[in-house]
Regions:
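Conserved acidic donor-binding segment of nucleotide-sugar-dependent glycosyltransferases
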Residues: 303, 308-315, 324-330
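Conserved donor-binding/catalytic core segment of Leloir-type glycosyltransferases
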Residues: 180-196, 202-205, 217
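Membrane-proximal helix-turn-helix segments that form the acceptor-binding/catalytic region
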Residues: 53-57, 74-77, 81-85, 99, ...
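Short hydrophobic beta-strand element within catalytic cores of glycosyltransferases
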Residues: 260-263, 281-292
Length: 371
């Protein structure tokens, strides 16, 4: 709940049972607050860990294995407690390196007591896990450097549901509603957070404001959104539109409206190990990518032929790249087609899910053999 607003159907309820595509989901109470301020944010993290641990113990049906995902790191801790209490093998899924990424975005300095405490939790989870699933090769390398056994590490990169994300015409109802006409639309879709370097995109929009054939679209929520909106209004960046968060089922229309998708992170050595999962959805929609994330993500986009790289936080290079796409629209169309073909071959979510399931079967078999 990045805005601190809990949907009415969940308010003042300790536990809500739901079903999602045949899977039972237990939604537990959380202290929801706007994603601003370390103390309140930490309280939100801790409240979920405690409620998930409690209700997980009482209501989750018998299982063969317990999987927990991080971040945030206390989710992993909740899974570990439940697995230990039930004497079941524990699998940790690492989608971001906490608390290292907290330091990387400048939220807390290295050596801060909170960071040291999280590092203790992190090390314990790595020791306790029967298997650790990471989403990039670089994450695996970093954890091996920190003493985690390579034998328990498995790289499972994100993929895409190719049946859900299907290329569509750019003449959408959203384009009409926003009065975009045939203008070229460069979009950022996703979390508006400290890590995402969106001031750079606004700097680019401001620089290119004279181009009436170009608009910038921001879709999403996050800790930085209100500040970014205030900046747009104060500096009169009239070619930038911040839509806020839209329902997940409108994602295809958003991508279809877009001529170029922007994927950005701040300049940090840590982020060279990150692969933003949105690049797979964008490619599946046959939209070109302008990527400002170096490292593994860059290697994927360049190998696909579905996009271009500009250095993180480089306003001049990003502006030039965007103008190049505006002036030669056929280039972006061709890149989008190559990107779709590439993810269809390499990042089909069904195939990746089968590999993940093989890992879980191996964990369960090993646990039973030593029981």
């Amino acid at each position: 709940h990045p805005t601190g607003v809990v949907p009415p159907e969940y308010r003042r309820r300790a536990l809500v049972r739901e079903e999602f595509h045949g899977v039972e989901v237990l939604r537990t109470w959380i202290y929801a607050t706007p994603n601003r301020g370390r103390v309140k944010r930490s309280a939100g993290y801790a409240s979920f860990a405690l409620s998930a641990t409690l209700w997980g113990q009482l209501h989750v049906r018998p299982a063969d294995v317990v999987i927990a995902t991080s971040p945030q790191l206390l989710c992993g801790a909740a899974g570990y407690v439940i697995a230990s209490a039930r004497r079941r093998p524990f699998v940790l899924e690492v989608r971001d390196l906490w608390p290292e990424s907290i330091v990387a975005v400048g939220a807390l300095p290295a050596g801060h007591p909170d960071i040291r405490g999280l590092e203790i939790v992190e090390r314990q989870l790595y020791r306790a896990a029967r298997a650790i699933v990471v989403v990039t090769d670089a994450f695996k390398t970093r954890l091996v450097e920190r003493g985690v056994s390579a034998s328990k590490l498995h790289v499972m990169k994100n993929g895409v549901d190719l049946a859900r994300f299907v290329p569509a015409p750019r003449a959408t109802a959203l384009r009409t509603r926003l009065g975009l006409g045939d203008r070229f639309v460069a979009s950022y879709v996703g979390t508006h957070g400290m890590a995402h370097g969106l001031d750079t995109v606004l700097d680019v929009a401001k620089r290119l404001k004279a181009r009436d054939d170009l608009r910038f679209l921001f879709v999403g929520e996050g800790a930085e959104r209100a500040r970014l909106q205030a900046r747009v209004e104060k500096e009169r960046i009239t070619n930038a539109v911040l839509l806020g968060v839209l329902p997940r089922d409108q994602m295809n229309e958003i991508y279809a409206t877009t001529d170029l998708c922007l994927v950005t992170l701040r300049k940090s050595e840590l982020f060279t190990m990150v692969i933003p999962s949105k690049i797979f959805e964008i490619a599946a929609m046959a939209r070109p990518i302008l990527l400002s994330v170096d490292g593994e993500a860059r290697a994927i986009v360049e190998a696909s032929g579905g996009g271009v790289f500009t250095p993180p936080e480089d306003v001049e290079r990003m502006a030039r790249a965007i103008v190049g796409f505006v002036d030669d629209r056929s280039r972006g169309v061709a890149m989008g087609e190559r990107g779709r073909a590439y993810v269809s071959r390499e990042f089909d979510r069904d195939a990746l899910a089968r590999r993940y399931l093989d890992v879980l079967h191996g964990v369960v078999a090993a646990a039973r053999s030593t029981a």
